[in-house]
């Protein structure tokens, strides 16, 4: 499996590296993993805190030709990570729609999917995964220390990043390539793990509050405002 993983000591961004790599041809899927990112990217153009040696920073490159529902890519990747945290780290996690994995005291993982178009057609998905492995909450920048956590903080244990990385990639392969689950099973599993269902949530793009009631068959967040129901497929959603 190691020939399907590129390990880097340092890179500007695994996503930028993967972007160039996927356009150059070669067998997929493949993962780009770095020990340190100088320009790690998060959602909405924000930087992603990725200090040297403390986390898993990777981009998994997927050919989308056999992916039926593109909107489920991030959802499926979140399930892959959550299962490994449960099986390898003995941690029960929840999923904060659309792209965060939460533990009891905060966010431990963020997932960012970017679709790459070639000659007018969506050809690749770059699935960025960042996991806070070692360190304590006080080690984070002031603006995120109250909402972030690490595997070490939660368990008091040190985890082998290489083993953890390879287990996650193996599970991504099982879900995306070997079709470990049907799309319906993926959605049902994520519903069970959802941190948002049956709660009031604030949708920033709408600038208003809704009540989260379900996850749609294509991974959208189903919300209710009075008697009106709608499905949100992108944007930022926070707990009210």
Identify the residue ranges that each predicted region occupies:
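N-terminal lobe of the biotin/lipoate ligase/transferase fold
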Residues: 1-87, 91, 109, 116, ...
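A generic fold-level signal
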Residues: 26-27, 53, 96, 121, ...
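Long, positively charged amphipathic alpha-helical accessory segments at protein N-termini or as interdomain linkers
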Residues: 66-68, 75-93, 103-240
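Conserved active-site carboxylates
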Residues: 100
